């Protein structure tokens, strides 16, 4: 007698017999119910398992995870007791298994990622791709009927990502290699409720990177995808992914979540990039043999301080010391409130990029002992006692700090090679004065009493600036930008989702005139969306360099009078409507993109002079007549949602219109 462990074909859980008379069995983990059906062939007894429709559930849902008799006969995912006569063979015809309904989502249901529903076949060859979503996406890709699509067409798709939800299926695809040095062009498509068999993805035989999320759990084989290098999956064990492939050594990137074991990871001997959400072990020793690993991302989603967490008993990494011997690591991302010390990064010879998010790290002293470090990101980490060591990493070219503590700001003045800087929660920006190598600068949630320090940053080309304050209240002007002679991009839009540090205003509010920014020579993109300030329109001069302008939802004022006393500030002003000053747009003759949402505009007469306009956003206004746009011969995109527009007319020819 040979005994084989009984497992649920849906989730792999343990099955138990509920009723020996009706032969009803139930999965102890997911609750799925099955019936045993005997097939007697000489001395062999096979048990075919069919899932019954749970009481009160839609019949379609019951069929979703039905498995055919071929599954049981293969003896791969099922449980069985096999009684043999010793010959190891059988004779006589076998009873054909009953047909199992194909997986069909009920009307209006698009399927949940990770549901079992794929009938497993004995043969290695994947079934012919034939699901409605497959046909929809291939039409989007090739504009051909199914019969006209060749294997060569399908092989041309190099990247594929599919997400399904209750209302929408979304597909991302590219004909470019995502691992090449050239940035791939990724296209997207959205569809309504459609059936989708993730196994159909194997029809794209030239895939280099595949992201099916939890849908990969319904894929039996990826054999034949010889060029596949990257896989993103959820709720699929590593050993299962290994068995899908011709050779796991071909894979260089894995992005995983919802796994319970690292078993099989050693088979991916050429793995270069690994991302794991909720690593299923207490240490990282299994990763040490992966000598090609150069990127590691580990996210622990458990909140140790939560009093309502249901994950208190979850297996978590408590020992990160194995990282100290991963000498090939170039990039490391860690998110875990278990991490209190980062001594394991000391001396990593190749580490160039380090991100620490929401850790419990107390000291950053180890940063000075990472010789190759070029990029550092610190997000959260509210237990840090001293940010000073950040300034002792002279090789840094990129730095992002979200300082969520009252500890002193680090002195950044010695980081002479810094090219990109993002700071949040700083009490002073004086230490950035003189950072002549800076090209990108983002300042949020900071005290800007020393805003004049920005005038010394002549090399900065991109500036993002919002949610700031000073000891006198709000800013009075933006004149400190005049010294930033290299500025090409300025974004004062703000953080509209309301997330950020402390309770400060998330937008830019200036108690005075900001017209000087419109005259900034060399400025190509300017975003002042949702701003509250004055614009002295008479001071705005012609600026031929400006190509993109965002003026969404403007709250304009004039005649500011500000009075402060005893820590209280009172402000008086008069309101101004942007629509009364649209003639200023003629001073930007090379404008290509203009966004004017939510400004109570009633006409488009201003557009007649914008000959180079390609994109125009007018959402939520009072526009009724689009005829002035006929003169915008290069117009490609028009957003007129939430406007009482009647006929689009000739404007619609060749223009993408959101209406």
Locate the predicted segments by residue.
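Residues immediately within or flanking Cys/His clusters that coordinate Zn2+
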Residues: 3-5, 24
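Short cysteine-rich clusters marking metal-coordination/redox-active sites
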Residues: 8-11, 27-30
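Short linker/helix segments within small regulatory modules
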Residues: 17-26
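Short Cys/His-rich micro-motifs in 6-15 aa windows
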Residues: 31-41
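Alpha-helical transmembrane anchor segments and their immediate juxtamembrane flanks
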Residues: 58-97
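Surface-exposed cap/linker segments adjacent to membranes
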Residues: 117-148
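Concave beta-strand-loop units of leucine-rich repeat
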Residues: 159-198, 206-218, 227-240, 250-261, ...
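Hydrophobic anchor residues at the C-terminal helix/turn of individual leucine-rich repeat
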Residues: 201, 219-225, 244-245, 265-266, ...
